Amino acid sequence: MKVAVCLHGLARGSSVQADGAFLENYSTLLKKIRGADIFIHSWDEDIKERLIQIFSPISNIFEPQRKFSKEISFFRGVQFDGDTGINQGDLFKTLSFLYSRKESVRLKKEYEKKNNFKYDVVLVSRFDVGHHNNGLNKTSHLNFDPALDMSKIYQAYWNQTNAGASDHWFYSSSQNIDYLTLLYDKLPEHLNKHSDYTKLCKKGWPLSNAEDEFSGELFKEEKSKNLCQYVSGDNVLINNHSLYKFHLMEGNLWEDDQSIFLNKNLWHD
């Protein structure tokens, strides 16, 4: 079985405390991915040599944090007001996160093409597994089992599936993970007032419940018809969780038998 791990982003965390992973030399993550081929895209140039020494990646890109000025200018005129039904995100942060994830997976794809094979299992993940918000973020705890059926896509369970996917990590077949990272390229299509994504945000978000945001409509037989409305007027929602949900729905990967949510037990206390 051939397993790839695509790591991306800021290796020491960002605005949320997550440097415990760095301080422990990523031992929590390394225990989970022992024997896998590793690919890295990171903005942390200053610790490049240390990360290469720790992970021994097949391929890597370390570059200065991009400003995404050109990409942001494309959205000039789009209304991203804070008056939304769930948290309004930040365009720069979304571009940075999704680009880095896409680049780490691109390295994997190039290696597959060069060597004429496909990985059986691909995990795409942030670096701070088990340490996000000092470990209090349950979705950061990685439950990685390469023996599972990779026609499905695996992600961390959380109590906000009505809104979208917990996007800390995913694993599946190589093909499914390739599709997952296409979200970056689809942002101009989704983040405009006329898009199908925005229409759903405005008219009624699928598998949501306006009376109970934590109801887990995806897992219910009888689903609420009282859907959440996240935006109004010309406003457009930037929310990674909702964008991933919409993207997976478009790829027929959000159904209850296709998206498998792990670590539900962490939410029972």
What are these regions (language model features)?
Residues 1-20:
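N-proximal low-complexity "stem/linker" segments adjacent to membrane-targeting elements
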Residues 41-115:
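Active-site-proximal specificity loops/subdomain of glycosyltransferases
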Residues 7-12, 42-44, 123-131, 159, ...:
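Short, flexible loop/turn elements at secondary-structure junctions
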Residues 15-19, 49-52, 131-138, 142, ...:
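A short acidic (Asp/Glu
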